[in-house]
């Protein structure tokens, strides 16, 4: 992973930090200063000198993809970019919006550490993205804020695009900070999954103040996050992956005339392992590979079972089947009594279960539940 923040902060009346690098600093500082320092020969776009910073951050998406792949497909998880606030009790701007763009071109983290005088020169910085093949590679617009459509050749950040031939969609995320001391926590599911699938360039993200909050006549100093170089590992930037793999087994709370899911877990020496087919000794994977018989008295019903795929990814050694029992079925349960009569008389009902291969030749598990 890597991170940095780039800035055009004015150091003196004739010098700015536009070519300075702070890639090894322990903080990521997001700020805007409006008309607070004079600068000789200012030729900016606004009526007064405006000083900005913008954050750059990237992660090892190959490692992330490798850790996710056993449990979830690319469309089966949620991903969040997390930056920890370290302003503490210090004054911070409030009531502002941030925007998070996917970056379009590569950039260097750099070796700079000086966030006070900005004396460490290097790339990346406000003007230059990287030093590649013996040459400076400039941002398309100073400050890395040239935005546009995916696959455009003259952009620094991607604002929209079509992923895998789908409809055009916005590819940035936003967050509102009411009090100013909140952590940044934004949904980047689309951006990350598209990056891992090869539809977005794997260059990380740019974080900036959003829209008019970069062009208005207000100063916002300083929103400070921990960088990856902070000593506390729990404060470092991260991508949080979330997916739902819980198993809500209905054996002890089945309701008549309502479908419930039952689960079968197979372990060998404590480790999850797929069932083996009795006919050819191959792993039983996918849907509809099991036949599950539920019976009591003269009543029986068969349900199809298969591997459990909570995040669109089949889980090793976990199988599920869904079933519903009709309370008013006429088949006798005991002593010629049907479900309804038996329940009213005894207050309970025992159901037997048998998990078999789809051909019903091999039994993997038998049991019962009330």
At which residue positions do the language-model features occur?
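Secreted, disulfide-rich extracellular signaling modules
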Residues: 1-370
């Amino acid at each position: 992973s890597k991170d940095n923040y780039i800035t055009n902060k004015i150091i003196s009346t004739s010098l700015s930090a536009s070519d300075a690098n702070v890639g090894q600093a322990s903080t990521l500082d997001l700020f805007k200063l409006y008309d607070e320092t004079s600068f000789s020969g200012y030729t900016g776009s606004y009526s007064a000198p405006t000083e900005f910073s913008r954050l750059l951050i990237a992660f090892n998406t190959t490692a992330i993809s490798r850790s996710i792949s056993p449990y979830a497909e690319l469309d089966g998880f949620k991903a969040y970019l997390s930056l920890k606030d370290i302003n503490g009790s210090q004054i911070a701007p409030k009531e502002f919006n941030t925007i998070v763009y996917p970056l379009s071109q590569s950039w260097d983290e750099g070796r700079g550490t000086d966030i006070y005088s900005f004396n460490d020169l290097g790339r990346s910085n406000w003007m230059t993205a990287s030093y590649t093949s013996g040459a400076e590679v400039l941002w398309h617009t100073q400050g890395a804020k040239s935005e546009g459509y995916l696959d455009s050749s003259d952009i620094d950040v991607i604002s929209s695009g079509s992923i895998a031939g789908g409809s055009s969609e916005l590819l940035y995320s936003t967050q509102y900070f009411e009090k100013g001391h909140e952590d940044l926590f934004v949904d980047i599911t689309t951006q990350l999954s598209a990056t891992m699938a090869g539809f977005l360039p794997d260059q990380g993200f740019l974080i900036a103040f959003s829209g008019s909050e970069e062009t208005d006549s207000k100063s916002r100093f300083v929103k400070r996050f921990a960088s990856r170089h902070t000593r506390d590992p729990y404060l470092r930037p991260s991508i949080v992956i979330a997916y739902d793999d819980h198993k809500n087994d209905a054996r002890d709370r089945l309701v008549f005339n309502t479908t419930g899911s039952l689960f079968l877990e197979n372990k060998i020496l404590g480790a999850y392992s797929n069932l083996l087919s009795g006919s050819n000794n191959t792993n039983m994977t996918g849907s509809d590979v099991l036949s599950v018989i539920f019976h009591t008295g003269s009543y029986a019903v068969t349900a199809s079972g298969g591997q459990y795929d909570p995040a669109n990814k089949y889980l090793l050694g976990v199988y599920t089947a869904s079933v519903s029992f009709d309370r008013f079925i006429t088949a006798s349960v005991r002593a010629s009594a049907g479900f309804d009569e038996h329940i009213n008389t005894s207050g309970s009902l025992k159901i037997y279960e048998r998990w078999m291969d789809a051909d019903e030749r091999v039994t993997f598990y038998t049991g019962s539940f009330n």
